[in-house]
Each structure stands twice: as structure tokens, then as C-alpha cells.
């Protein structure tokens, strides 16, 4: 995603490579090794194939052209099809794997690798993937219209939106998943892991959360998950849960997937707050996780990582190592934070009709200036803070509604 604004040619090459890892039924390899030549990791995750939809959509919006959708790419298990056909099969694969609650099956896991245990018997479902599907369906509907194809993507979107709000809302936030036994993970009645970050952020990113729930879910994130060094992945951290004999994770409390500040996921919180029109909170979440700021607050002796690169995670407050940065350089945080900052805080975002200018700024910023090269032109953009450029998330809206023409 972060490569696309700088070099669409390189981005096309990477997308060609990624799409070649898709199977004819629409799922993809989880890992592959084009340099080393190792055999790919073929376990099926419920989220992999949806990221490709979002990446191709971003490329099309950047270029303002449909030719890449018509390019033929081979499937991993043989035959060729257009990129557009690849994307359609990615969506169809989700619908071939729907659980008893009407949500996408978790399969081996979703974005959170720790959740592989919730679907070992094939019945666990992912609320996060339901929301990811929502965003992908909206993007597919727009692409289909541009391609001149009749489609039912928006109808599917509305149906999944109704389902996830009916079965996964827990009163103050959204559940994270269901387990094989039908029990929900990430709800108040459970003794641990009551709230999970990704279910709340993606409820907003997808547009599936009604306005009141969107605000309430993100307010719960702030209340239960935010720390001075970033937003935790879950709260409270787990120990011997759901059973001592077969816990979801063996990580200590506050470590890794078990209650750390997982940096990659923080970028989605920045985007979610921008979509709600809360620039001050979005900037707080963005700035507190900047490596130099996190290191300064934790202290060099505690942080123990470079102040100029993101780490995968930072040990959370339930650990006696709170503030220790873990696995620097190996994370999607930088790419997603770039998207969060440029397209949502600064609000300069490619759309089919041009370059949308819809900033969501913290009140202490008087103005911003941005230079953006877009479709062969160099734009220099000045925005004075306080000018009403958008109406934040309200019922029935998935993103900002323009109050006047803010696309150039």
C-alpha cells in the first residue's frame, strides 16, 4: 500500500507476484519465498485473500485506470485469469466458508495467528474478517460499476452488516470471534480477553458499525486498551484461558499477542478515529507510537530498540518488562502508519475522480502544506485548520460526506 503512491510500476510487479499465489478457489498461500525458493506455507487463513482486493483497489484509484484489472495472472494451481477474476474469486472463497452464526469461518487463523485454536474443529468464526469483507465488498462494488458489470456486492455488504451487528455486538464493543463450541471470544462475560482492538477498529473501517456503536466501540478502546506507549491488543491479558490444559496462548501476560502494544494494529486505530472525525485522538495515537517518542517515554534502558524504526510490538503494562520493544524492522506498521498519516490525518487520498482532500487535523495545528505527485502532476496543497471540509461518520455513512467539492 505504501509503495503505490511512489512507484506504481513496482507495485504492479509485487501485485503480480502476490496474485500468483492465489488458488483457483480464491484462497492464497500464507507465506511464500520467491528469493530462497522454499516451499510455500499452504495453511489457509481467512484474511489473506482479502488484502489483495484492498491493494489492487488502491492501485486502481492511484492510477485512475482499469487496465490492470484486465491483466492475466496465473493461479498457483494452474490456469490463468484476469486480475478482476482473481478478486472476484477472493470474495467468493469467503462465502464458501461461512459459519453457523453467518460470519466467515476462521479457518487456520486470521490476521492474528494466535487464533488458530478457535477453529480446529472447523466451526470457529472471525468477526474481524467479517468487517474486512465489508470493506472489500464496498471496494468491489465500486470497481464493478467502473467495469460496467452488474453485481450484488452492496447487497452482500448490507446482509453481512446486519448479521455482524446482530450477533457480535456486546453492548459496549464488538466480540472478536467465535470458538468451535459456539462461545464468543472478546465479550464482557468472559474472565479474560474481554475486548480486542482489531474488532473495534475494523468495525469503523468497514463502515458496518452504526454511528453510535462506532463511537462507543472506539471509546471502549481508549478506556480499556490505551497506554502511554500505544494501544494494547487485548484486555485483560490471558493466563490459562480458556482452559489451563489448552490455552489460546503460551505468551506471558503483556507479551506478543497476549496484551502487548501491537504496533501494526495501532495504525488502524488512527484511521478509525479519523473516520469518526476525532483528529486530536487520532494524532495522539499516531504520535505516541512514533519510535522516538515511545523510546523517550519508556527510556532507552527499557525500550532497547532503534528510535527510527517501528517494532512489531512493545511489552504491555501487565508485563514486568512494560516498554520493551520487540522484533524491530519486521512489521507492517510503517506502511500502514504512512497510509494513516497521509490519507486520513492529512486527508490526501486518491479516488477515481481525482485526489480527495479531506483532512482530520488535531486542533493545535493551524494549517498544513502537502506536496503530492499524482497521475503525472505535482500538487501543492495548503489547508487551514477549522475549515469545514467534511461531516464525520453518521448513520448510513461509511466515510466522510463532502460538504462541497473537495476532489481535485
Description of each model-found segment:
Residues 223-226, 239, 251, 255-258, ...:
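Non-catalytic C-terminal accessory modules of carbohydrate-active enzymes
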Residues 63, 140, 144-147, 280, ...:
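Long alpha-helical scaffolds in large eukaryotic adaptor/regulatory proteins
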Residues 35-39, 110-127, 181-191, 238, ...:
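Active-site-adjacent structural elements in folded domains
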Residues 9, 15-27, 50, 57-127, ...:
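Active-site acid/base region of carbohydrate-active enzymes
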Residues 1-103, 126-134, 260-282, 286, ...:
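Aromatic-rich carbohydrate-recognition surfaces in CAZymes
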Residues 29-30, 132-245, 287, 291-322, ...:
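Catalytic cores of carbohydrate-active enzymes
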Residues 1-4, 42, 46, 80, ...:
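Hydrophobic alpha-helical scaffolding
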Amino acid at each position: 500500500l505504501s509503495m503505490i503512491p511512489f512507484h506504481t510500476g513496482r507495485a504492479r510487479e509485487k501485485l503480480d507476484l502476490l496474485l500468483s499465489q492465489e488458488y483457483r478457489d480464491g484462497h492464497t498461500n500464507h507465506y511464500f519465498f520467491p528469493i530462497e525458493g522454499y516451499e510455500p506455507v499452504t495453511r489457509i487463513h481467512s484474511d489473506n485473500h482479502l488484502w489483495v482486493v484492498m491493494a489492487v483497489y488502491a492501485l486502481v484509484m492511484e492510477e485512475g485506470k482499469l487496465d490492470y484489472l484486465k491483466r492475466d495472472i496465473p493461479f498457483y494451481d494452474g490456469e490463468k485469469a484476469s486480475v478482476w477474476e482473481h478478486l472476484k474469486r477472493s470474495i467468493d472463497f469467503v462465502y464458501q466458508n461461512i459459519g453457523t452464526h453467518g460470519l466467515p469461518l476462521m479457518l487456520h487463523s486470521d490476521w492474528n495467528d494466535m487464533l488458530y485454536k478457535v477453529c480446529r474443529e472447523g466451526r470457529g468464526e472471525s468477526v474481524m474478517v467479517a468487517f474486512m469483507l465489508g470493506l472489500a465488498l464496498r471496494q468491489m462494488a465500486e470497481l464493478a460499476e467502473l467495469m460496467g458489470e452488474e453485481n450484488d456486492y452492496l447487497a452482500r455488504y448490507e446482509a453481512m452488516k446486519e448479521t455482524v451487528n446482530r450477533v457480535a455486538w456486546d453492548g459496549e464493543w464488538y466480540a472478536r470471534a467465535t470458538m468451535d463450541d459456539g462461545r464468543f471470544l472478546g465479550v464482557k462475560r468472559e474472565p479474560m480477553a474481554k475486548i480486542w482492538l482489531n474488532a473495534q477498529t475494523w468495525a469503523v473501517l468497514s463502515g458496518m458499525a452504526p454511528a453510535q456503536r462506532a463511537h462507543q466501540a472506539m471509546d471502549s478502546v481508549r478506556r480499556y486498551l490505551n497506554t502511554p506507549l500505544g494501544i494494547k491488543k487485548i484486555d485483560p491479558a490471558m493466563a490459562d484461558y480458556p482452559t489451563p490444559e489448552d490455552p489460546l496462548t503460551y505468551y506471558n501476560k503483556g507479551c506478543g499477542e497476549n496484551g502487548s502494544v501491537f504496533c501494526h494494529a495501532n495504525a488502524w486505530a488512527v484511521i478509525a478515529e479519523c473516520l469518526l472525525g476525532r483528529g486530536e485522538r487520532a494524532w495522539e495515537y499516531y504520535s505516541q507510537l512514533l519510535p522516538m517518542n515511545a523510546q523517550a517515554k519508556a527510556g532507552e534502558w527499557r525500550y532497547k530498540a532503534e528510535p527510527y524504526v517501528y517494532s512489531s510490538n512493545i511489552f504491555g503494562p501487565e508485563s514486568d518488562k512494560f516498554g520493551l520493544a520487540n522484533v524491530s524492522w519486521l512489521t507492517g506498521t510503517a506502511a500502514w502508519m504512512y497510509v494513516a498519516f497521509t490519507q486520513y490525518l492529512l486527508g490526501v487520498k486518491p479516488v477515481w475522480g481525482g485526489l480527495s482532500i479531506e483532512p482530520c487535523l488535531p486542533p493545535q495545528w493551524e494549517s498544513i502544506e502537502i506536496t503530492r505527485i499524482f497521475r503525472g502532476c505535482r500538487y501543492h496543497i495548503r489547508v487551514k485548520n477549522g475549515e469545514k471540509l467534511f461531516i464525520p461518520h453518521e448513520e448510513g455513512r461509511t466515510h466522510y460526506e463532502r460538504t462541497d467539492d473537495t476532489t481535485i
